[in-house]
Amino acid sequence: MNVLICDDSGFARKQLARALPADWKVDLHYAANGLEGIEQVLMGHGDLIFLDLTMPEMDGYGVLETLQREGLRNKGIVVSGDIQPEAYQRVMGLGALDFIKKPAAPETLLALLKQHGFWSAEPGNTAATAAAPTSGIVADAGVKITPEIRDVYQELANVSMGQAADLLARLLNAFVVLPIPNVNVLEVSELHMALSAAADSDTLSAVCQGFIGAGIAGEALILFHDSSFKDLAKLMNHQGTLDRTAELELLMDTANVLIGAFLRGYANQLDTPFSQGHPVVLGQHRPINELINTNKSRWRRTLAIEINYRIQDYAVQCDLLLLFTEDSIATMNNKIMHML
């Protein structure tokens, strides 16, 4: 049988391949996005597809829609960082066989394969694999981020982002549209440019919360677009006047959900618990340049993870930035080396 792992993260592809039963007699194939996945399917390489949802070119929903539209009988199991209830309902409605969250545990995959009749133990069986794309990596104690290391950071952020979105979706009873996280090492001037680019609205409200744990430290920053407050109040069933005090309460509630859930997910994957400081309001209804100038002394060279959250069918948008100190990068790189 031909099994296809379709995910834009090379790290996630390798992680999933390692989690499959060692005695499963299959040929493994790989695709880095939905279009490549469809090409592999048409080549006969996807009797069973393990499918990520958030990908460039064509996402997992697009793959399932294409399979359904073309009448292709390939079976798809979604393995996703986006674990919102609506994401589950959408993929099952598009004909997915099953849905599990990232990272997929070996015991979960084994139970799933048994449940759907894809696996039975046979003495001497080994998986015949087409090796996942990889390249030699040498640990670097400095701040260098290789493409392979960046890919791991992006996948860790993808899983954490999905967990935070799931909590927010349940709180608001709405669907959160998720992007592919941006990961970069930024100088101070570049960080200012990134903050300006992230904020495409006239004025913002911002909350910052510090965190620290075992050689890793940084700040989580929420940039909330002021045009979002009206719809956010509606989603949270806010009663009464929407004044600055009410907006601050909505802002803090949203920040607590997104920052707290993201940091828990990230810390769990690095096996490093974080202690979180008290959230600090950096400003309300202020232009991004004013926020940057007022707080520029806070930020130095940093590893930045940027995620834009949007609520489908509502004018609600905010940016979450995780800013890790330069000293933290070497510690995290070393932890990641043990995951590769």
Question: Which positions does each model-derived feature cover?
Answer:
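Alpha4 helix (beta4-alpha4-beta5 surface) of REC/receiver domains from two-component response regulators
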Residues: 62, 83-98, 111, 121
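Helix N-cap/capping motif at the beta->alpha junctions
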Residues: 30-39, 59-63
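Active-site beta3 strand of CheY-like receiver
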Residues: 44-50
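Two-component/phosphorelay signaling modules centered on CheY-like receiver
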Residues: 10-29, 69
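Receiver (REC) domain active-site loop signature in two-component systems and cognate sites
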Residues: 55
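A Lys-centered signature of the CheY-like receiver
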Residues: 102
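Active-site residues of response regulator receiver
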Residues: 52, 80
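Composition-driven recognition of glycine/serine/threonine/acidic- and proline-rich low-complexity segments
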Residues: 87, 122, 127-147, 151-246, ...
